[in-house]
Amino acid sequence: MKSPAPSRPQKMALIPACIFLCFAALSVQAEETSVTPQPPDILLGPLFNDVQNAKLFPDQKTFADAVPNSDPLMILADYRIQQNQSGFDLRHFVNVNFTLPKEGEKYVPPEGQSLREHIDGLWPVLTRSTENTEKWDSLLPLPKPYVVPGGRFREVYYWDSYFTMLGLAESGHWDKVADMVANFAHEIDNYGHIPNGNRSYYLSRSQPPFFALMVELLAQHEGDAALKQYLPQMQKEYAYWMDGVENLQAGQQEKRVVKLQDGTLLNRYWDDRDTPRPESWVEDIATAKSNPNRPATEIYRDLRSAAASGWDFSSRWMDNPQQLNTLRTTSIVPVDLNSLMFKMEKILARASKAIGDNAMANQYETLANARQKGIEKYLWNDQQGWYADYDLKSHKVRNQLTAAALFPLYVNAAAKDRASKMATATKTHLLQPGGLNTTSVKSGQQWDAPNGWAPLQWVATEGLQNYGQKEVAMDISWHFLTNVQHTYDREKKLVEKYDVSTTGTGGGGGEYPLQDGFGWTNGVTLKMLDLICPKEQPCDNVPATRPLSESTTQPLKQKEAEPTP
């Protein structure tokens, strides 16, 4: 006797399971068809630990990026023999057996360049090509040229690249945009996901998932052909983020997936390893030792997962904003990540429709709708009036307002009335003379006050514009651009982050000195310049007087000016 046909709601409930089971095979296949390179801390074992603990280099990333001159097993064997001999010199041993990363030549821009000219001149300076790498290099080869952030960041970074690509597109370099999308697709095919950066020690984690948005950007130039071409890789990346969901029970978490008590599926940041990060080895060990009440492996995992978030580090992840060892990234459901997952599902639906698979498109729409409901239910703080992260330990939405709260607006997942409240909260609590504060907390960490970061400025600007909040959007763009221009006028460079409590000052805090270059700042600056100035009269520098925003959707006109605040 046949079972009765399930009702429509039951059918819809089965859809996600079907997708997850089908695509889980994709991620497994990707992992099985490639040999995952081992990171230097595994290849070199005790030698790596000893070199990093000896602090031979001011930046721990230096030795993580060093290339062994011969088989690491042979180097390690030699080290074991020599290390206890009289007069052994560890620095000399390293210099003989490794090729250290070269410091890039300091770029000196031509005199008299405008801000736009400076950025356009930087694209070739920041472009790298690594089709082939040394056998034991931590650098992962990529088939096409790519643009790096700059400074100590000698490799391509995942979420940085999206904002860099916005600038490349604005400059008309669609060939470079296409190359970078192809590189990320290559990584998905080879490793099952896009790593934090193209280094072996970054393979255990990803970063905020912007690949689908990169494909959507490329589609602005190539049309639906880009969506069709990269649909398989977008599906594989989605499978990576949802890996483990098919066996998850209510109230459980598995890797990057969280299933709440009512069955709502959301995501969190996660790193597959629970050891010190090779690029910050000594710092991580010190952080773990400073809190003997927690297992070191737990702290290492949360440090790594914070790096996966892109916000390394921030009071956002900590119980005590002044103590990094209280961070617990893996027990927090981030509002920005889930907004990006919603956007990924929407783009997957669009791409599925482009290839004529309407059934699959409807399935992704169902997943996106379910996630949107989850965002509205769990990631909105009704008492405070803003979006926030959800705490898996307290089973409550957190109270802290951060710039991540603008992501639901950026991806058009926010309710209209809530977007209005977000505009008020942003202007009241985060807007500063030099742009948007990352948080309102001063912790000494780089993803806290008083630092402002280019990608968050753009997310906020675009998100607020999506909901007609143009005055606040203009405030953010103008304040940040003024900061960038003043810094450029004084130092002739763009930097990684800015102090937004004033204008004309680079940001501070964190594990390393301020870096210049800088990929995502360049990209966002170009987008904002073209936002505030009409296309028929583009500006090469930030105008001396502030354009007035309009209540309409028209571009902000340069001629309608008021005195600069």
UniProtKB/Swiss-Prot annotation:
Q: Which organism is it from?
A: Escherichia coli O1:K1 / APEC
What top-level class of enzyme does the UniProt entry assign? hydrolase
Q: Which GO terms label this protein's molecular function in UniProt?
A: alpha,alpha-trehalase activity
Q: What is its EC number?
A: 3.2.1.28
Quote the InterPro entries the UniProt record gives.
6-hairpin_glycosidase_sf (IPR008928), 6hp_glycosidase-like_sf (IPR012341), Glyco_hydro_37 (IPR001661), Glyco_hydro_37_CS (IPR018232), Trehalase_periplasmic (IPR023720)
GO annotations under biological process? Answer: cellular hyperosmotic response; trehalose catabolic process
Q: Name one GO cellular component term.
A: periplasmic space
Identify the stretch annotated as signal peptide in this record.
1-30
Similarity section: Belongs to the glycosyl hydrolase 37 family.
Reactions performed catalytically: alpha,alpha-trehalose + H2O = alpha-D-glucose + beta-D-glucose
- Alphabetical UniProt keywords: Glycosidase, Hydrolase, Periplasm, Signal
> What is annotated about its quaternary structure and interactions?
Monomer.
- Positions binding substrate in this chain are R152, W159, D160, N196, R205, S206, Q207, R277, P278, E279, G310, E511
Q: How is this protein named in the record?
A: Periplasmic trehalase
Q: What does this protein do?
A: Provides the cells with the ability to utilize trehalose at high osmolarity by splitting it into glucose molecules that can subsequently be taken up by the phosphotransferase-mediated uptake system.
- Where are the catalytic residues? D312 (proton donor/acceptor), E496 (proton donor/acceptor)
Q: Which residue intervals make up region (Disordered)?
A: 539-565
Annotated localization? Periplasm
